């Protein structure tokens, strides 16, 4: 049987003192298994091998608020905020702002500044310059916004540049933003997606995130909202903080194989392919209630620390890249699409292998 579990100290000792390869380390601790590329495995949910941000990683549960800071402060990224449930006025203000028409803050109040901005937009697309949100104008805005790509809002994303610490707060009726002149405590849904431009990152609590899209979800959640990172499996592994980054690359390669296998197993276990989209992780109602995630970010699943782990030392990222797309498989039971739930620990006192 394969399920003995990797010990990290044992993997490090073997790799440091002999010619053990990462595959040999894995085969020692997980008997009768085979390392394969995901492309060689018939996956029940193949998006994990191809979709850029298929894996949803739980960062916080039942949050009442979060503070999000853009980094680096010297050259902060542009934020793109997609919020479901905006009123037509607030949604039109978001759209006009993203197109450079300057309707004023997104406050849901239709004043002269919003009306004038709307007239300018109507003129730019050949519509009657009524300055009001008529059906023709609203349909045109929604049609154009749909070209922006996947977004929780039918009006497209609100784009904020120049650096910011944004607060997202649940008030019991929904969520609102503050902390920037463009947002003005307008309550809408807590179904929110936040992305940032390439090269930048965001900080939430102790973690920094360079990759993925931040997701807030409140559907089927008992209180507040869950905070999740939708991220590519390889970029997720960059932030997996289970072994010191300076350890031997071969030992770290074994850890990368184990960590990737564990994450893929959890994804396949939780994901419902027919329901999975960029905006919906394809999770059961009970899983949505619990975390809106395929996998957690604490030691009870795998400890995910994000960008600060990625820059802690070159060996870990090299190990992830060296094993890119590879998982541990087993032809027997207790697997997901033959991918094992690869358990591991720091040390077991020498008692793992039969």
Tell where the protein language model's regions lie, with residue ranges.
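Conserved, single-site charged/polar hotspot
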Residues: 1-104, 109-354
């Amino acid at each position: 049987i394969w399920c003995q579990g990797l010990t990290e100290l044992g993997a490090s000792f073997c790799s440091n003192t002999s010619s053990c390869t990462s595959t040999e380390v894995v085969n020692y601790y997980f008997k009768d298994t085979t390392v394969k590329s995901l492309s060689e495995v018939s996956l029940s949910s193949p998006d994990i091998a191809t979709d850029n941000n298929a894996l949803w990683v739980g960062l916080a549960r039942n949050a009442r608020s979060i503070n999000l800071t853009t980094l680096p402060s010297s050259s902060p990224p542009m934020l793109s905020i997609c919020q479901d449930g905006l009123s037509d006025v607030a949604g039109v203000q978001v759209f006009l702002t993203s197109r450079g028409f300057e309707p004023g803050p997104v406050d849901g109040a239709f004043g002269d500044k919003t009306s004038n901005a709307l007239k300018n937009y109507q003129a730019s697309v050949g519509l009657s310059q009524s300055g009001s949100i008529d059906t023709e104008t609203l349909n045109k805005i929604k049609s154009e916004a749909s070209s922006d790509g996947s977004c929780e809002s039918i009006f497209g994303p609100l784009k904020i540049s120049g650096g910011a610490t944004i607060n997202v707060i649940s008030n019991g009726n929904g969520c609102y933003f503050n902390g920037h002149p463009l947002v003005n405590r307008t309550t809408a849904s807590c179904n929110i997606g936040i992305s940032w431009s390439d090269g930048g990152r965001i900080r939430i609590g102790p973690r920094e995130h360079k990759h993925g899209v931040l997701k807030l979800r409140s559907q089927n959640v008992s209180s507040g909202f869950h905070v999740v990172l939708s991220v590519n499996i390889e970029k997720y592994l960059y932030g997996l903080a289970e072994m010191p980054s300076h350890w031997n690359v071969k030992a770290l390669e074994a850890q990368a194989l184990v960590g990737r296998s564990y994450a893929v197993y959890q994804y396949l276990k939780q994901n419902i392919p027919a329901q999975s989209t960029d905006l919906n992780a394809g999770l059961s109602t009970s899983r949505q209630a619990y975390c809106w995630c395929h996998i957690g970010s604490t030691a009870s699943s795998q400890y995910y620390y994000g960008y600060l782990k990625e820059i802690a030392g070159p060996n870990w990222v090299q190990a992830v890249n060296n094993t890119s797309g590879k998982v541990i498989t087993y032809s027997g039971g207790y697997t997901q699409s033959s991918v094992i739930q690869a358990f591991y620990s720091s040390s077991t006192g020498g008692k793992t292998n039969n």
